[in-house]
């Protein structure tokens, strides 16, 4: 309404996905920047158009799809799950069985992506529906232990079904990201090789990044729309007060099972895309650490929110790269003189007799970059749970509300 932008005249206007012109313009700018990022046309962000960063951003988009699925179960329905990696593995191996190439020791049907990608989500969803009757009978800590058990069961199965997974430490090749009608040799759109679009030379990383922007946006839109439907309101009622929700007529068992199935669909699709994006994956990759990363994403980003999950995905995926870059910069400073060199020598342990937080040698003292990332994940989860339960999205709300209320503080 003109002059009253925050006044919604109807329920439909209040529950719209993009309720204001500002949000619509912001989303349009975001898509414009994202789709032109590989062309390195955006001032100040040209470095993100390099292939190494496009791979990192592509992984973040895939993680966002998986995290949106976990957010349905944990953020919307309030059910704690540490078994997300298991459902991602189910989706990944469904994809490789349907789309992978067969050999003397490996199973593969060679079907196109428009079959194996939806099938990965569907099979993972059916697996989640099979697990749900057992999982919905418990809650809280007991539910967490049940879902942890899925990860260890999956790890055992993935390692030993060698004609599907390729075996521990070996893995197998996943089907490429390309569009075909059926099993023909040439593809309609090959996203796994360098080429040209509209006369412009683009790398495979750029092609896959644009594809993942589109796919992840569709999943984010579905996630956002789910929150405002009858199913989403039932999830929120169960999360906030499950007994009261059941008294009011919400079928708790049915909606919890539905939350597991929907969450598993997102996880299966994300697992298939992740394995195809990197080309191969060993069975050990679908472990508990992967599940913890997704827990970190929704807690750091903001549980129950779409924007928070997207922020958390980019944050968690980019932290290891930023830590690696930061430690490399500190290592360059250790041989120089000055206050920065003193700080670098204090933080880094460059020799066996040094004392430092981060080690630069595989067998020396200090934490490795991988271990430091785990410490950062844990510390950030604790800090956000204590000081800002809504995560990065909560910080954004504080900044936005301060800006809207300035110069007043109330």
Task: Tell where the protein language model's regions lie, with residue ranges.
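Transmembrane alpha-helices and adjacent helix-loop boundaries
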Residues: 1-410
């Amino acid at each position: 309404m003109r002059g009253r932008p925050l006044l919604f005249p109807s329920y439909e206007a209040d529950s719209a996905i993009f309720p204001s012109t500002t949000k619509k313009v912001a989303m349009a700018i975001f898509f414009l920047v994202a789709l032109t990022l590989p062309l390195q046309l955006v001032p100040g962000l040209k470095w993100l158009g390099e292939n190494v960063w496009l791979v990192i951003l592509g992984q973040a988009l895939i993680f966002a799809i998986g995290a949106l699925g976990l957010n349905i179960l944990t953020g919307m329905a309030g059910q704690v799950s540490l078994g997300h990696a298991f459902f991602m593995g189910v989706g990944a191996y469904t994809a490789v069985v349907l789309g992978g190439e067969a050999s003397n020791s490996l199973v593969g049907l060679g079907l196109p992506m428009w079959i194996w990608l939806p099938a990965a989500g569907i099979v993972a969803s059916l697996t989640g529906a099979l697990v749900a009757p057992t999982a919905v009978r418990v809650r809280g800590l007991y539910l967490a232990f049940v879902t942890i058990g899925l990860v260890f069961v999956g790890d055992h199965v993935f390692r030993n079904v060698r004609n599907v997974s390729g075996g521990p430490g070996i893995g197998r090749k996943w089907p490429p990201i390309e569009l075909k009608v059926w099993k023909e040799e040439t593809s309609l759109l090959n996203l796994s090789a360098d080429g040209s679009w509209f006369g412009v030379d683009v790398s495979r990383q750029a092609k896959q990044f644009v594809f993942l922007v589109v796919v992840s946006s569709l999943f984010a839109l579905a996630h956002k729309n789910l929150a405002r439907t009858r199913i989403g309101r039932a999830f929120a009622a169960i999360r906030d007060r499950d007994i009261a929700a059941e008294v009011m007529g919400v079928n708790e068992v049915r909606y919890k099972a539905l939350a597991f199935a929907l969450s598993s669909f997102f996880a299966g699709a994300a697992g298939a895309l992740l394995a195809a994006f990197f080309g191969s994956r060993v069975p050990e990759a679908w472990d508990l650490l992967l599940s913890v990363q997704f827990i970190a994403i929704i807690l750091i980003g903001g549980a129950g929110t779409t924007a928070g999950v997207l922020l958390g995905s980019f944050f968690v995926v980019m932290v290891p790269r930023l830590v690696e870059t930061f430690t490399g910069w500190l290592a360059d400073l250790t041989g120089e003189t000055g206050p920065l060199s003193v700080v670098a020598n204090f933080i880094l342990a460059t020799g066996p007799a040094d004392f430092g937080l981060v080690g630069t040698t595989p067998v020396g003292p200090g934490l490795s970059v991988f271990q430091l990332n785990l410490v950062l994940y844990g510390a950030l989860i604790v800090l956000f749970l204590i000081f800002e339960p809504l995560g990065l999205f909560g910080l954004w709300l504080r900044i936005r509300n301060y800006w809207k209320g300035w110069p007043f503080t109330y």
